[in-house]
């Protein structure tokens, strides 16, 4: 499946899933508004496995939303 790319509060979110044998994990990246490209990506802490690729995408996106909200709370 292609990476899931969405937006939240003008941030860009990309979730890249990968199979880990019987489960799925993901690499989760975000970009602040106005930034793009791999050099501007920020990695989101995410260390969860899921039973399906779709579930890995969903939980990865949830982790990104929490990360963005935490960054916004810092001011």
Predicted segment positions?
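N-terminal segment of the canonical double-stranded RNA-binding domain
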Residues: 1-36
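Acidic, low-complexity intrinsically disordered segments
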Residues: 40-75
